[in-house]
Amino acid sequence: MAIINMSDLDLQGKRVLIREDLNVPVSNGVVTSDARLRASLPTIELALAKGAAVMVMSHLGRPTEGEYNSEFSMQPVVDYLAKALSCTVRLATDYLDGVEVAVGEVVVFENVRFNKGEKKNDEALSKKMAALCDVYVMDAFGTAHRAEASTNGVGLYAPIACAGPLLAQELDALGKALDNPARPLVAIVGGSKVSTKLTVLESLSGIVDQLVVGGGIANTFIAAAGHNVGKSLYEADLIDEAKRLVANAQSRGGDIPVPTDVVVAGEFSPTATATLKSVSDVSDSDMIFDIGPDSAEALAKIIESAGTIVWNGPVGVFEFDQFGEGTKRIAQAIADSKAFSIAGGGDTLAAVDKYGIADKVSYISTGGGAFLEFLEGKELPAVAMLKKRGA
């Protein structure tokens, strides 16, 4: 089933309602990180260039639903967009019963979470939003995994529902990485807990040629291999699960390699002293915070031979430089690789920024939870809705 793309539509004189992910950090009324806003600009500019009357909506933060709270107002986003687009951008506070918007104009709706029923995908609210437009554009990959009124319900009732360029790019990149990858396909999954990424690990272990685990997740696999992990964060109740995942990968000719050397310390602190040890020499008082140089080189070799790389999560506590060498080496290997690479998730993007490899990664996903759910093999509610409307 084909999804309609906004770029293929004639929008001249049309009222176009775009759902973007403009959920950005704001401090004292000023946007402090504009990555999501920058990512949304080409879609808004394209709608204007196509002669549309443009309405934009998003959530911002986690206000109490149905209650106005100035702390979560879209005003700072409106100010940013007015500068970035070099045109007048208005904030509409009461818009559900109709809003005046002219061709060539941009109106941003106040925080959609100020509307009661937004998160429950309320039908009446969805229909009111749909009545405001001729064309609804879903462009917020970061919220595509949530079935809410502004991301899902509105699209069921709008005259036309389509994917914006940003969402289309995300789906193309993820499809290229997972549905039809150039092999070998290597996935790097980091993070603190196996439990939060278990479904991802299960899904990926069935399709990748090599699965690399890092961070606290790796500690559980180290313990499963029979090594002492000392006071490290790990999940004893998931050791059998880790063994099963390794066996599953090996049965397909792949593997989930366990680090041979690790970087440990006696405490979790920015000033903790880092000590390099063989994985078999970890003491009861040690905490593992990174992989060692031998392990990092072995993983770099796996990455260098890859045809496709999916990266979600650092392999160490890279926020502290003494525990960042493993993640830095992985980042460098991805940057040097000729493979198609996709990176996603907040910590991963922070590592991409820290090690300056953004322009060397083929595609950087804007979605956190949505990226993970896609890796889990789930169909995202927004995508299901767009397929239904495109049929």
From Swiss-Prot:
Keywords: ATP-binding, Cytoplasm, Glycolysis, Kinase, Nucleotide-binding, Transferase. Its EC number is 2.7.2.3. The keyword Ubl conjugation does not apply. GO terms for biological process: gluconeogenesis; glycolytic process. GO terms for cellular component: cytosol. It is an enzyme of class 2 (transferase). Monomer. Its main location: cytoplasm. It is found in: Cytoplasm. ATP binds at residues 197, 319, 345-348. It comes from the Bacteria. Substrate binds at residues 21-23, 36, 59-62, 113, 146. It catalyses: (2R)-3-phosphoglycerate + ATP = (2R)-3-phospho-glyceroyl phosphate + ADP. Pfam families: PGK (PF00162). This is Phosphoglycerate kinase. Belongs to the phosphoglycerate kinase family. GO terms for molecular function: ADP binding; ATP binding; phosphoglycerate kinase activity. Pathway: Carbohydrate degradation; glycolysis; pyruvate from D-glyceraldehyde 3-phosphate: step 2/5.
